[in-house]
Amino acid sequence: MLGSRLTFCYGFLHLLLQTHVLVCAYPNSDAVVRDTDTLKTLLQRLEEAYLLTVRAESLERGQVADGMPEEQSYEAEDGSQERLAEESAIGYITLDAEEARLPDRNSNGFLNPLRNTKRYSGCFGRRLDRIGSMSALGCNGGSRLSYKRS
């Protein structure tokens, strides 16, 4: 009789420990929802604070902000190179400054390197010329892998 009660107590204790482990592994969903809501509001506050500091820095440098006229634009300033150096040091560049550094996509200078990647010697044709240049066959002469003896 005492043995059955003892095994029942051990079994019940084991069951309680297993439920405790499961409760700890999967916390209450209400607490998780509250934590995610708190994190979302904290993230929104952080984004707002960051935007305010960026706007304050841009106003200090005289850049265009929301509601400022175009005459006070930073493009009218003479120190555009200094501004680019400052912005790259800070870690962000305005879209206009990034577009100014890129070449014009419609000009021929932009597409020429892409078009001239395959050289055409005229011996066999474009495909065979490409194969021939790799295997030292064709009109190009020796291979780039062969060693010149002098």
Curated annotation (Swiss-Prot):
| One MF term in the entry's GO annotations | hormone receptor binding
Origin, by domain of life? Answer: Eukaryota
Q: Where are the transmembrane segments?
A: none
Main location class: secreted
Question: Where along the chain is composition biased (Acidic residues)?
Answer: 68-79
Q: Which organism is it from?
A: Acipenser transmontanus (White sturgeon)
The UniProt annotation puts the region (Disordered) at 62-83
**Gene Ontology CC:** cytoplasm; extracellular space
Q: Could you confirm whether the keyword Disulfide bond appears in this record?
A: yes
Signal sequence bounds: 1-25
Write out the function statement from the record.
Cardiac hormone which may function as a paracrine antifibrotic factor in the heart. Also plays a key role in cardiovascular homeostasis through natriuresis, diuresis, vasorelaxation, and inhibition of renin and aldosterone secretion.
* Tissue expression per record: Atrium and ventricle, and to a lessex extent in brain.
Q: Which UniProt keywords apply?
A: Disulfide bond, Hormone, Secreted, Signal, Vasoactive
What Pfam families does this protein map onto? ANP (PF00212)
Task: List GO BP terms, alphabetically.
Answer: blood vessel diameter maintenance; cGMP biosynthetic process; cGMP-mediated signaling; negative regulation of systemic arterial blood pressure; neuropeptide signaling pathway; receptor guanylyl cyclase signaling pathway
Protein name per UniProt:
Brain natriuretic peptide
